[in-house]
């Protein structure tokens, strides 16, 4: 069997889903989705989900926390790797107004490190990359130099693609609406501790 490890760019996937479907399919079963993308003769080893914790918004924090807890309970092959948000000042050139925005940091670096490290440690035969971030191309090239026996396939989220990534990987595919629709977590997930986690009403 061909061992597959999946690497999910959380923000690339999130914004692709929102652009195409709004919040309708954010309660996504990542393990189920990746499994639906496998080909005959492939077996899923792990799903690594790269994201960053929301801060300074109580409602958003709870929705994200409930989702991650539901994933942990329902999808045992999923591991979450946290990046971070960094505050950055912005200034309007015309009126001089200033404001602060929060930018997600470290996700692409974390994916790059995991992709290369897992290849060197022989944790997969094929890497499935759910992202359209061309910043990952150098890591892909490094991985293939170090382990030319490994394959990498890009799975582009809705309304996301990259010509540079298409050139860097061995193959690519587009994640179809039917796969996303059929890969939703149960509306209610109950943890081993008896905690009830419901899909947020906001995600409809």
Regions found by a protein language model. Name each.
Residues 79-204:
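Nuclease catalytic cores that cleave nucleic-acid phosphodiester bonds
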Residues 1-102, 151, 155:
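Domain-level signal for Mg2+-assisted phosphodiester chemistry and nucleotide/NA-binding surfaces
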């Amino acid at each position: 069997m061909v061992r597959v490890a999946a690497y999910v760019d959380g923000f690339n996937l999130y914004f692709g889903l929102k652009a195409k479907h709004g919040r309708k399919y954010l309660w996504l079963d990542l393990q189920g989705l990746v499994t639906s993308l496998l080909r005959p003769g492939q077996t899923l080893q792990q799903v690594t989900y790269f994201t960053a914790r929301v801060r300074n918004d109580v409602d958003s924090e709870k929705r994200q926390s409930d989702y991650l807890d539901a994933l942990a309970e329902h999808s045992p092959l999923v591991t979450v790797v946290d990046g971070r948000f960094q505050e950055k000042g912005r200034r309007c050139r015309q009126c001089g107004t200033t404001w602060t925005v929060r930018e997600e940091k470290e996700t692409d670096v974390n994916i790059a490190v995991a992709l290369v490290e897992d290849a060197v440690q022989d944790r997969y035969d094929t890497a499935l990359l759910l992202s359209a971030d061309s910043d990952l191309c150098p890591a892909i090239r490094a991985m293939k130099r170090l382990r030319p026996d490994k394959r990498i396939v890009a799975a582009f989220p809705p309304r996301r693609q990259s010509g540079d990534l298409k050139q860097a990987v061995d193959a690519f595919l587009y994640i179809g609406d039917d796969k996303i629709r059929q890969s939703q977590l149960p509306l209610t997930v109950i943890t081993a501790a008896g905690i009830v986690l419901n899909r947020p009403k906001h995600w409809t």
